[in-house]
């Protein structure tokens, strides 16, 4: 990440190429979104994070939030630059220069003056310690420790750049706290991210200065006082007595909002890729038509997010067994389903593409923010002046988080629409209602409860999509009359990510159930087909005297009925006269009998006379064969293996079934849907889903299939 320039080198700012940074912003979006997510994952797993003031990315703050292995790094120029701004503050005060936050009050009361710079910084930290933790109430009002650690990292990164007037020793102390996994306790609420995240950051400053109300949490979750935290972290020399401007440098920045935003966006990017792959699996289990991914369609629309989403789905579906089987099905009976798939499938690239673009743009915006110098005033040593501006305004955070949250809600809406089709036997092309897998559908209601839960998740997610940034209130005696609400928006986006994880986990469980049901369907249909074929040969081929019988010509049409009839429409009682299979098999024989003409008058050539024998033998044999096929699957010896192994989506299925140890849900077993969904959700939260997700796409070359 380029952007910050060394203090004291003004010529570096007078650049003629890309002076407005638009080119740099555009360059950051080169390459595929998937490649960027892969880089995020690689950097997340990097055992060390180097802090240099300009090189932090939104891909690299999540690791330090979760681990205790950050390491500091700085170029030879950084300490000199940093100390020069610190010296400049002291010299200007000693020379009687009037500087905001050094000799003046703060905000709307900056008309006040003092020469006691040390006491002023001490008072700043005291009055900003305005947060509520709710100790003893049973409810936590403490910022998640991961977000606090991300904030510490981002604040160090900002202050390293040398425009804030703070000593290196203070930054070194914060780094030691990070490296020893010691986390200050910050209030969850109380910041508007306008003059930065003043209130929460003041608690980090409070720990550094040894305020008696400051608390921290140790590596094992133990509560620590400031003194215990310093001792455990190996910070020498006791608590810091802040010099002029140092308190302001610590609290006047956007680190809490941007730190949390970077964590949120890491997960949002992964969930975006997951939604693309889940949409492709949806096409597989729904017998969809893969032409919706054809590159020409999307190239003509021009949007890169859409083009990439379609290309990823196209890659998953390419050579998929399910797509080959669906193509044969559509060719055999083109009227069995609509000519075009419904929008939740057919327009999924068009729907997901803009959401991916929004999330990617937000990621870059936050990346720029966490590398920015965002306090006030800024010390320009080269021009011997303090610049009073507003880089502490966290609008990039509020806007990017609002936009990301809306994108996440849209992804969730698509997932819900697809899920609703999947569990509905009017739309799911032959799967059972509620994805029930038991023998008796009257005692197995499958995913009915799950669908209710999904509606709840989706409703909450849609509510969370409402913007935060349009609820600004004027604050601090109308000095902070517009404010970004960046951390609030980041917190709400973190909630949205959690809800989308619930939806994605639940949906993945449902898709795995559908895959197993397609496997069961194929084996049951194979058993029915073989049985009908054998019974037809035994009862319809020969007459009573051993001669060839006219009914032998019914066999092909009987098998066509089996091929076209949804097996789960009759599987619980395959010989029931109330179910379509037996009705249509009988109708085939009746139709042939009506065409048999004068031969029907002869008992030895009558097809009508054969119907009873055919049905009686089928009733005697078919239920046993259907049960045998089902039992073979349950015992691990199916006649036909699960075709998912022939698909690029197999790694996700394998992860859910083998690594997590789950199986097809049925009312015949005690395991509830929630137990399985909980397992998958935990794996998603732990990052376990990432490797199988990327495994599905490991052979994708980053381009759509050629159209010519």
From Swiss-Prot:
GO CC terms: cytoplasm
GO annotation, biological process: cinnamic acid biosynthetic process; L-phenylalanine catabolic process
Enzyme class per UniProt: lyase
Alphabetized GO MF terms: phenylalanine ammonia-lyase activity
The reaction(s) this protein catalyses: L-phenylalanine = (E)-cinnamate + NH4(+)
5-imidazolinone (Ala-Gly) crosslink, residue number(s): 194-196
Record's subcellular location: Cytoplasm
Pathway note: Phenylpropanoid metabolism; trans-cinnamate biosynthesis; trans-cinnamate from L-phenylalanine: step 1/1
The EC number(s) this enzyme carries: 4.3.1.24
The family this protein is said to belong to: Belongs to the PAL/histidase family.
NCBIfam families named among the record's database cross-references: phe_am_lyase
Name of the molecule in the record: Phenylalanine ammonia-lyase
Record organism: Ipomoea batatas
Organism classification: Eukaryota, Viridiplantae, Streptophyta, Embryophyta, Tracheophyta
